[in-house]
Amino acid sequence: MKLAACFLTLLPGFAVAASWTSPGFPAFSEQGTGTFVSHAQLPKGTRPLTLNFDQQCWQPADAIKLNQMLSLQPCSNTPPQWRLFRDGEYTLQIDTRSGTPTLMISIQNAAEPVASLVRECPKWDGLPLTVDVSATFPEGAAVRDYYSQQIAIVKNGQIMLQPAATSNGLLLLERAETDTSAPFDWHNATVYFVLTDRFENGDPSNDQSYGRHKDGMAEIGTFHGGDLRGLTNKLDYLQQLGVNALWISAPFEQIHGWVGGGTKGDFPHYAYHGYYTQDWTNLDANMGNEADLRTLVDSAHQRGIRILFDVVMNHTGYATLADMQEYQFGALYLSGDEVKKSLGERWSDWKPAAGQTWHSFNDYINFSDKTGWDKWWGKNWIRTDIGDYDNPGFDDLTMSLAFLPDIKTESTTASGLPVFYKNKMDTHAKAIDGYTPRDYLTHWLSQWVRDYGIDGFRVDTAKHVELPAWQQLKTEASAALREWKKANPDKALDDKPFWMTGEAWGHGVMQSDYYRHGFDAMINFDYQEQAAKAVDCLAQMDTTWQQMAEKLQGFNVLSYLSSHDTRLFREGGDKAAELLLLAPGAVQIFYGDESSRPFGPTGSDPLQGTRSDMNWQDVSGKSAASVAHWQKISQFRARHPAIGAGKQTTLLLKQGYGFVREHGDDKVLVVWAGQQ
């Protein structure tokens, strides 16, 4: 989850005119939005480590380690000591995209760990390719190009094939006797991420649940109608796309109303994305009902597709007029007839008048009224600057991210249920003696696994919750999935355990502490820009792919090109397919990557444009060729675990760029002919 744009103006301006500095390092240079880098030659020894930005001093919050993501906090009296074990060129990289800065320290190795065999981008004249396959396929073997379905017989260690006209010069080579997809492996997963509300409307009757409605403008932050039934309707499409895991936005009940959207408050922002949860025991009515969810999960499993829920344990949603009125918490500055006159019969129908914005509803709310706000979540559940609640802290674990109420997941005090649940008659939450907020959250979330056979979670804002909480979630969800599979042997896809991946801004291909606390993979934030540098020459991915294939023999990452929190990757047209789908490790397609879904309206929040409606009209229209290209490469990936899980050997070819990936008995050879 990215920070809500309506609050960005209140955060430190990490990405503006001021520059980061650190003693002993030259001024940092910006490398992409929100990331800053500086290099320095340093001697072996011990030195203090502090960083400065706009007269604010920052220091690592934890022990200083190389190649680890370190959270930064305001400086205390004693700066931490950094022990340098050898002379070398050190790099400091600061990432501010999550709203709180993080630091990564690395050192230049004496020799490159992996040297690319590609010196310049190969050129191709469009003629058939003669490929030496002697080290991959035996003499006399029948080798198939999966893309074109051509078959060639290995003769004198070589084959000759013509890349298909629509393949961008690719040959996807496998043994011709390969006739089915291999058993599923999370290291080779192709995950399709959808914001359910923006994908497909399968049930228009639920579009205006809880009194939600359109804004009559650009509909930037309103609910658009996508739901669980719509997802089920498109499972055949996803299966044809080679998808074997579907990550859906959190389907739990969200705040019912809206908050002001964008820095200018120029649109109402509803929780269509699933990141402002209000009740983890209910489905949001806009998403559908429990029968819809069961049908989705069962139908997906029948097609070999796993279901992942997006989950949030760091924060709740904002207070909205709709929820204040319905659940009787909070306080207004208005009284008597003033309430109806200013807000109307139904408060959520309020609209800004001349001179007001969608932020202006806050002017009617008395955020200091202790009695009124005690009726909301309660002090045992959250910290926030509202009422008599404990104030948020300044570190990653206790801060109020984008001014969202921070859940006290670290608390060891029994909390009872959220206070306003007393007025929420439809909740399935039951009080459990001794339970803390963390206990309730992990119990509620794992219950969805136990009831429906959910295969995994994608964890939002992982760095803002203490690691033991994630381990607790993984342990409980894993037990729940085992129970479900035992009770539903006819529905279970296999005996694979519960899978969990997480979002920690700036995380790359490194085996961090998250992997020791329940996570099977972390989202790879580095891959988007690495791929952008290779859109004109696939061979330029060689070093990145070699390094990933080598490192990922011991762990896994989830790499992406586009996301709802960064940008849509539209460079190179359908070349994005091979850039993503041939990557080592698990990969994530963001809905519409395959069909070049257009950027949508944004107002004063540029991220909103990444969440546009799925362009179904283009799938069978102007983007049909692109979709077919994605399908072929993704289906090839699904047939071969070696692509995601295998070791890579780069080949020195007379023409083009090529590599072999090998995992167990599975072996493939991929050739890119070169630029035409």
Curated annotation (Swiss-Prot):
Sites annotated Transition state stabilizer: 565
EC number: 3.2.1.1
Keywords: Calcium, Carbohydrate metabolism, Disulfide bond, Glycosidase, Hydrolase, Metal-binding, Periplasm, Signal
Subcellular location: Periplasm
Induction of its expression: Under the regulatory control of the MalT protein.
GO biological process: alpha-glucan catabolic process; oligosaccharide catabolic process
SMART domains with a match to the protein in the record: Aamy
Active-site residues from the entry: 460 (nucleophile), 503 (proton donor)
Needed co-factor(s): Ca(2+)
Top-rank taxon: Bacteria
Annotated signal peptide: 1-17
Coiled coil: none
Listed InterPro entries: A_amylase_MalS, Glyco_hydro_13_cat_dom, Glycoside_hydrolase_SF
Catalytic activity: Endohydrolysis of (1->4)-alpha-D-glucosidic linkages in polysaccharides containing three or more (1->4)-alpha-linked D-glucose units
Record note on cofactor: Binds 1 Ca(2+) ion per subunit.
Assigned protein family: Belongs to the glycosyl hydrolase 13 family.
Function: Since only maltooligosaccharides up to a chain length of 6 glucose units are actively transported through the cytoplasmic membrane via the membrane-bound complex of three proteins, MalF, MalG, and MalK, longer maltooligosaccharides must first be degraded by the periplasmic alpha-amylase, the MalS protein.
Oligomer status and interactors: Monomer.
Name of protein: Periplasmic alpha-amylase
